[in-house]
């Protein structure tokens, strides 16, 4: 029996989501479009298999084939990131980070991460996250120019003396200097942990410097700029740390791994290792630069005055409207983005004074410089007259026509 026959409610809602993804423009920086091949294996019989433990050391029988699958995923991950050890079992980026903390430090130890309002992530010590409850957290941020001042980070690190420094961000548009972070970590005897969830796809294509050999441990999601399934990974070059990480993930915070997702990670890594991937990642950056340049030409303020990666962060501190207003206006025009806090924030996290925009998903659809210039100017038009609902509707129809030339999926399920 087909899903349409068995559960028409879910079938219909899934197809409505397909329509939304195809007709609208996805510009949330952390979202992307994965491969049909990735979705195909995620919907396979591999979901039936319990495989607690690791390849060759399982707590269940019948794991001979899933052992081969997980080993293949591990080997591809190691090759992709040019590292010696990889754990592909984390169910998410947040759980990967949780596993890193559990492996490297003890509850109550101090961690130093980027302030959430300056572009960091919840799992880098934010008080509302378990990382800020189980561990004592302190923060560095960006300066008024929107960039990290590494001397300031050094001063904070020497004063606070954390056991672990987290580098990586969810809304930072500039290159991260991993070598400088390692210098600082070494000066105070701390671990350096790089969370590259947002930039991993650029890193493996050579479009952003790698955290190896500087970071003791590296984590990432496998979706976002990697375009794989939703999940997490942890990498290191240190055998002893690898053992601790493995124990922290299982049996520490997870039970049976999701073998259908691990297989999908392996498929995604195969794509990431291809020459086609390098072309894609380069275009992601090029498109982001077009977006940044058009918005600045149209007199909008960008945090750090541009971008080096896949995203731009707009600041509305000089405008009457908020990030939430901008988010809603773009949404009405068929562009999905997200409100975001900015340095010098004056509004609540639910309102914000910023907007984060990314190019990975549009690039996956085939958008290049010409299309990005059109989209960027429409964004500026909308934000120049943020309450004009008629304009938003007109632009929505124009963008719908544009999107129809770049259909990425013909059906909702594979």
UniProtKB/Swiss-Prot annotation:
The keyword Amino-acid biosynthesis applies. GO terms for cellular component: cytosol. Its cofactor is pyridoxal 5'-phosphate. Transmembrane segments: none annotated. It is an enzyme of class 2 (transferase). Its main location: cytoplasm. GO terms for molecular function: glycine hydroxymethyltransferase activity; pyridoxal phosphate binding. (6S)-5,6,7,8-tetrahydrofolate binds at residues 116, 120-122, 240, 348-350. Catalyzes the reversible interconversion of serine and glycine with tetrahydrofolate (THF) serving as the one-carbon carrier. This reaction serves as the major source of one-carbon groups required for the biosynthesis of purines, thymidylate, methionine, and other important biomolecules. Also exhibits THF-independent aldolase activity toward beta-hydroxyamino acids, producing glycine and aldehydes, via a retro-aldol mechanism. Homodimer. This is Serine hydroxymethyltransferase. The gene is glyA.
């Amino acid at each position: 029996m087909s899903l349409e026959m068995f559960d028409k409610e879910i079938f219909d809602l899934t197809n409505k989501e397909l329509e939304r993804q195809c007709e609208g423009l996805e510009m949330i920086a952390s979202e992307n479009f994965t491969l049909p091949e990735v979705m195909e294996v995620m919907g396979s019989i591999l979901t039936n298999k319990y495989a607690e433990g690791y390849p060759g050391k399982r707590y269940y029988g019948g794991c001979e084939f899933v052992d081969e699958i997980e080993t293949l995923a591990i080997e591809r991950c190691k090759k992709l990131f040019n590292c010696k050890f990889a754990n592909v079992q984390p169910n998410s980026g947040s759980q990967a980070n949780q596993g890193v903390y559990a492996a490297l430090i003890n509850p109550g130890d101090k961690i130093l991460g980027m302030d959430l309002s300056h572009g960091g992530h919840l799992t880098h010590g934010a008080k509302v996250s378990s990382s800020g409850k189980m561990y004592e957290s302190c923060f560095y941020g960006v300066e008024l120019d929107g960039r990290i001042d590494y001397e300031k980070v050094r001063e904070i690190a020497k004063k606070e003396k954390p056991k672990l420094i987290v580098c990586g961000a969810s809304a930072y548009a500039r290159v991260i200097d991993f070598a400088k972070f390692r210098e600082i970590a070494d000066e105070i005897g701390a671990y350096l942990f790089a969370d590259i969830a947002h930039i991993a796809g650029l890193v493996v294509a050579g479009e952003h410097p790698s955290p190896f050999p500087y970071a003791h441990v590296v984590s990432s999601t496998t979706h976002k700029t990697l375009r794989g399934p939703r999940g997490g990974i942890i990498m290191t070059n240190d055998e002893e740390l690898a053992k601790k990480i493995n124990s922290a993930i299982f049996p520490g915070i997870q039970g049976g791994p999701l073998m259908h997702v691990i297989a999908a990670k392996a498929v995604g890594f195969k794509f990431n290792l291809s020459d086609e991937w390098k072309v894609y990642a380069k275009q992601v950056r090029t498109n982001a630069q077009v977006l940044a340049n058009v918005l600045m030409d149209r007199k909008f303020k960008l945090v750090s005055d541009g971008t080096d990666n896949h995203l731009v962060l707009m600041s509305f501190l000089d405008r009457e409207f908020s990030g939430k207003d901008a988010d809603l206006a773009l949404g009405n025009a068929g562009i999905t983005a997200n409100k975001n806090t900015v340095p010098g924030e004056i509004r609540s996290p639910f309102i914000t004074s910023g907007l984060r925009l990314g190019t990975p998903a549009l690039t996956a659809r085939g958008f290049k410089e010409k299309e990005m210039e059109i989209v960027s100017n429409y964004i500026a038009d909308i934000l120049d007259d943020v309450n004009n609902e008629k304009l938003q509707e007109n632009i929505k129809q124009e963008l719908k026509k544009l999107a129809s030339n770049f259909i990425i999926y013909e059906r909702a399920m594979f």
